[in-house]
Design a protein with these regions (language model features):
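Glycine-rich phosphate-binding loop and adjoining helix at the ATP-binding site
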Residues: 127-170, 176-234
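Beta-hairpin "wing" of winged helix-turn-helix
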Residues: 73-90
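Short glycine-rich, Thr/Ser-proximal phosphate-binding strand/loop in the N-terminal lobe
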Residues: 19, 25-26, 111-143, 185
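Extreme N-terminal segment that seeds HTH/winged-HTH DNA-binding domains in transcriptional regulators
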Residues: 1-57
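Gly/Thr-rich phosphate-binding beta-strand-loop-beta motif of the actin/hexokinase/Hsp70
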Residues: 93-130, 236-241
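Basic amphipathic alpha-helical segments that dock to polyanions
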Residues: 54, 65, 69-78
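Short beta-strand(s) of the beta-wing in winged-helix/HTH DNA-binding folds
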Residues: 50, 79-80, 179
Length: 241
């Protein structure tokens, strides 16, 4: 989970979160994303960023950046701040953009044989709250797993003071063979059932969009977003359990 990774990174992890989250290097699929998304993720990855730097980084016109960022500001996703990275200057303070962190919230969960863990994060990747529930057994039926996930979500919302309508989406990881594109758990050491469309069942239970994947795949993404993988082209994550 992202929370475990950030704690393991210690002060360096805190520094990374405060200076943005997300990959710092361009990914192969970047050019296929909508330009509005590229602009937003460029700002989020850098923590804060002047419009001219966004235009230069994405190789687009300043006018296009102004149009896109104005829309993102109107939607409550970005906000203007004084550009603290450029130091003092005469006249009007330089302006940068940063993510409006409280505009959206997401939940990440890890399901395991001993306990299930959940974290609530804002749009800037800051952890707002954490919650845990003990797993009733080493391997569970799908029905029991859905019940425990629902209980975990209730506990997280209670600790954070948020309600379900504040949450935009949920990402869930668990060990085993997971078809992330279809949301199907083919086999998992924490579940009795096989070939279960767990993503759709969880989405129906929670009433929210759900993304489901193998927990090590998600740990690798956490390293890409928060850890040493942010600024390098290739890396590997090895887990020993």
């Amino acid at each position: 989970m992202a929370s475990e990774l950030i704690r393991d990174l210690g002060s360096e992890g805190s520094k990374l979160v405060s200076s943005g989250c997300g990959p710092l290097l361009a990914l192969p699929q970047d050019d296929t994303r909508p330009l509005r998304q590229q602009v937003f993720e460029q700002v989020r990855a850098n923590g804060q960023m002047p419009r001219m730097d966004v235009a230069r980084k994405l190789n687009i016109s300043p006018g296009s950046v102004t149009t896109i960022t104005s829309d993102l500001i109107a939607r409550g996703l970005l906000q203007e701040v004084e550009d603290s990275q450029r130091g003092p200057s005469r006249g009007r303070p330089p302006i940068a953009l940063r993510v409006a962190p409280q505009s959206r919230f997401v939940v990440g969960m890890k399901l395991s044989d001993e306990r299930h863990t959940a974290v609530l994060l804002d749009l800037a990747g800051t952890i707002i709250a954490e919650a845990h529930v003990a797993s009733a057994s080493l391997r569970q039926s799908t029905e029991d797993m859905l019940t425990e996930v629902s209980s975990l979500m209730d506990r997280l919302l209670q600790k954070s003071g948020r309600v379900m309508s504040d949450i935009s989406a949920v990402g869930i990881g668990l060990p085993g063979l997971v078809d992330a594109s279809l949301g199907i758990v083919k086999w998992s050491p924490v579940m009795l059932d096989t070939d279960m469309p767990l993503r759709d069942l969880l989405s129906k239970t929670l009433g929210l969009p759900v993304s489901l994947d193998n927990d090590t795949n998600l740990l690798t993404l956490a390293e890409l977003w928060f850890g040493a993988g942010r600024g390098i082209s290739n890396f590997a994550v090895v887990t020993i359990e």
